[in-house]
Structure formats: C-alpha cells, structure tokens
C-alpha cells in the first residue's frame, strides 16, 4: 500500500502528533509511506497532481484545497483520507462571530470529496456527519516511551505553573495575567514558565521564558508542577483536541483547565486535576495545588493513567492502520 501524507510542516504540532510519529509503525507494518509538504508553487502543484495516481491513498492533514484544485484532486487521487484536529469550519476565539459561511463551505467541499475522514474528537466527528457518513475519531496522542513520568523526588525551591503552546494560542494564557500577578504576590515561591516562541511579562510573579525546542519539549514539561490550559467556551475551542493536557498528563503533571470541549473528558474534576471558570476559581485551584505537593503527585499519576488508557501512539497507531486498510 502506497500512501502520500501531506502535512503543513515538520515542526507543526498537528503534523508531528497526527502524522509523523505514526510513520515508523506504519512502515513496519508494510505501508509504503511518503511524507511531503503541501504544494505551493506552480511547479510543485504540477508535480503533485501528476504523481497522485502512483499512490493508493493521499492523506491530507488539516489543510483544505480550494477550487479548482479540489476537483482535480478528486479526479487524480485513487482514495482520499482527510484528517483534522481543529474547528476549521468556524472562526477562531478572537473573532466576535464564530460563524463563517465561507469556512463552512470549504470544509463541506473537502469532506464531500473525501473517501474517509478522521476527526480529532467527537464534536468534530458530528460536524463531519452533516456531510459524510464515513468518519472515525482518532484522538491526538503522545508516545508513552518518549513521555516518561517526571521525578517527584526532586526537591525544588519554586512551584512552577507551566504552559506550552504556540503564538496562536498564547492569548488565552495572557488574559490570565492578573490572576498570575495575584498568585505571585501570595506565593513568592511560585513562578510561571512559558514554553513558546513569543512571551509576555508579569510584575509580581517570575516568568521563565523558554523557547520551544522539540528535543527539550519533554524535559520542559517535566519541569512543570502544575499545567494550565485556559480556553474560551466557544465553537473554536470545542474543536480543540487537548494536546496540552495530554502532554501534561503524559509526564504526570496535574492540570487546571477551562471545562470546555474535550477538556471535560480529559480532566476529571478533583481526580486528575481541576476545572476552573472565573478568576476566583482559577486562584482557588492554583492555590490548592501550590500548597499541596502530595495532591499534585496524586493527581499527576491519575492523569498519566488516563493518557495511557487511550491517548498514546501505541493505542492509536493500530486504529490509523485499520483506517488506511478500509475499502
């Protein structure tokens, strides 16, 4: 079976976690896998479309083709699988109105020319079912061998509140700046660690600014004592697949999150982390975990157990292989 995987970039999170980490497993099971970036130039497009018949499957990760390339794609490709892990049919949380007819139209067109669709969560699956019956949920996952448990025996002088992500989502964290200021004032030994490519400052809490690097990602996560994932409860957020939480839990870090979308499934309030809505709840839950290292470890271990149940490459790779073999 020859499969062409189209991705947005080799360092893009969705490409790494929904395609690239599965390639070794697929190849070891007889899949002739080729990974390529989406064509951009005229020359790249000509080569891409001329080569399509060579492959049994073209696997598109997230990005949608527009007309007239969409029609040409359907004509040239033997079989199309579309994978996505964001609410691409809505505007993002920065917009006042999430509804976009043009986005929804492009999404529908992409779904309708596909033979099979892989959605990152149940909300996205239900969006697909409006246009196509052949859809399956495969969650975003991590490699349990790479994401090893943090060492809780290491004694630290500071309690680190951590967040990892990219510049497109840091605005959720930045809105919490007043909360972090008050936490820093109450707990002088607390700090905020941001692993990203852009940062912001706070006056009353020390901010550790760490540029994201793939080879240091797990170590950075293990340095967190509390992982946070604030969101806005809107359609864009409902489409998120909880990678931050899965990463935190994968190394045994307790989580505080906004109970929106998949966050409610990943975090059992009071078991492997806490839900928090307004400023008072965020301060309350942060305070509880800052003051109680035993609870942090207990919740962290529960979180890792949750991830190992179904959010690992080891659990999801066979499911992806099964989809590729569907006729």
Each language-model region and where it sits:
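Conserved catalytic-core segment of nucleotide-activated headgroup transferases in glycan assembly
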Residues: 10-25, 143-147, 154-223
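Carbohydrate-associated surface elements
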Residues: 123, 141
């Amino acid at each position: 079976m020859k499969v062409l995987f189209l991705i947005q970039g080799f360092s893009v999170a969705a490409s790494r976690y929904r395609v690239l980490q599965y390639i070794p497993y697929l190849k070891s099971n007889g899949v002739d896998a080729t990974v390529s970036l989406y064509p951009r130039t005229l020359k790249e497009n000509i080569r891409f479309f001329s080569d399509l018949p060579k492959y049994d499957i073209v696997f598109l990760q997230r990005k949608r083709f527009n007309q007239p390339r969409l029609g040409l794609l359907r004509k040239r490709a033997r079989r199309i699988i579309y994978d996505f892990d964001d609410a691409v049919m809505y505007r993002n949380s920065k917009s006042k109105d999430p509804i976009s007819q043009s986005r929804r139209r492009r999404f529908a067109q992409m779904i309708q020319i596909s033979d099979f669709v892989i959605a990152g969560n149940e909300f996205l699956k239900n969006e697909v079912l409006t246009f196509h019956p052949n859809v399956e949920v495969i969650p975003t996952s991590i490699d349990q061998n790479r994401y090893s448990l943090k060492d809780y025996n290491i004694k630290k002088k500071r309690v680190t509140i951590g967040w990892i992500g990219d510049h497109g989502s840091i605005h959720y964290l930045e809105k919490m700046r007043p909360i972090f200021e008050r936490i820093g004032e109450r707990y002088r030994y607390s700090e905020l660690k941001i692993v990203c490519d852009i940062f912001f400052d706070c006056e009353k809490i020390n901010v550790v600014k760490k540029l994201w690097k793939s080879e240091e990602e797990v170590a950075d996560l293990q340095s967190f004592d509390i992982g946070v994932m604030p969101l806005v409860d809107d359609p864009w957020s409902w489409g998120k697949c909880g990678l931050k939480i899965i990463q935190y839990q994968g190394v045994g870090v307790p989580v505080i999150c906004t109970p929106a979308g998949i966050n409610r499934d990943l975090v059992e309030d009071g078991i492997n982390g806490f839900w928090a809505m307004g400023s008072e709840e965020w301060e309350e839950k942060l305070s509880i975990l800052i003051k109680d290292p035993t609870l942090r470890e207990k919740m962290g271990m529960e979180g890792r157990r949750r991830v190992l149940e179904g959010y690992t490459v080891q659990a999801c790779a066979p499911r992806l292989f099964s989809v590729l073999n569907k006729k």
